[in-house]
């Protein structure tokens, strides 16, 4: 999830550091209270075995849930005490029987509830206000003006990428203009995804230059590039499957907020949260996933997850959208709806760079096509021109008679 979060403008290193500090503050406060309660402090209650037991409480309760650690602590503490009191009476002798029985019970619990007890209990109890409420009266997030039609948004100049002795991209040149859909196509192994990653900041060119609105971004991280106005989807879907569709899309709008991790952790950002959730809901409706807004992202079909990634990318309000095989796994009607959405975005002035294998989808949609083979550009032009190019036909069909 870190690659995805960085691509959406999240400073993952800083966020993890702040969360670690907050957790340390809570631990320090707990230690202070413990010392005053016991009137005496010694190292034994803070040994490795006790630390593992505390960690086990979180795992059993549900480490991904707010109330999971509390549930796990309650269950393990009560269960251990009950076994210590009950087993000697059953066996008629004292001993560490509870350790064996407790271990077996924990194995069963973790087999039956791999995500912890709290999610299992939540499924058994009717939901009461568990879904996030969309405040229609929340003030919309500010939107940036789109560039003028025809302005060069992204340009790659002589981009080369080497992995040891392998040249994945060799002297690649391309550009994308505002209000245009450009397709980057080629056979498997042509180097499209490598090029895509260099343009979006996930990877760095060995040589050459990448310009975004006239500014060099080669070597810049994907987080910095996202703040400039570029957003993307991924070839292999990158979602947070246990979070709702709404929450996943809200990640895309993160960079449009002003609050830091600390106010968010202590729930001091309610107004901004309402604005971000409203934006996320708008983008979900925009791509046709409104009925799944509060469903877990992992429960959606693969094609719907790809559409969800597009909604998340749009939530960041980009002027350039990079889509990596967005039509893969979609049915015909879903492809048609995606095509209409992309045409609408183009009409609004957005630039779109598309990597796709579905030639029927591409040729009826895009304005220009760049074709790659073995890491090099072999053709560029209008869709009709490219389809008749002998080098393109040879790359795809092995030559023509």
Where are these regions (language model features)?
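Short loop-to-helix capping motifs
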Residues: 1-2, 64-66, 389
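Short helix-terminus and kink motifs of transmembrane alpha helices
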Residues: 81-84, 115-119
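Glycine/proline-centered hinge or cleavage motifs at structural transition points of membrane proteins
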Residues: 5, 9-10, 68
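Glycine-rich phosphate-binding loops of nucleotide-dependent enzymes
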Residues: 149-156, 160-401
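Transmembrane alpha-helical segments in multi-pass inner-membrane proteins
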Residues: 16-105
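ABC-family P-loop ATPase nucleotide-binding domain
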Residues: 118-160, 400-401
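Hydrophobic/aromatic residues within transmembrane alpha-helices
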Residues: 4-5, 75, 117
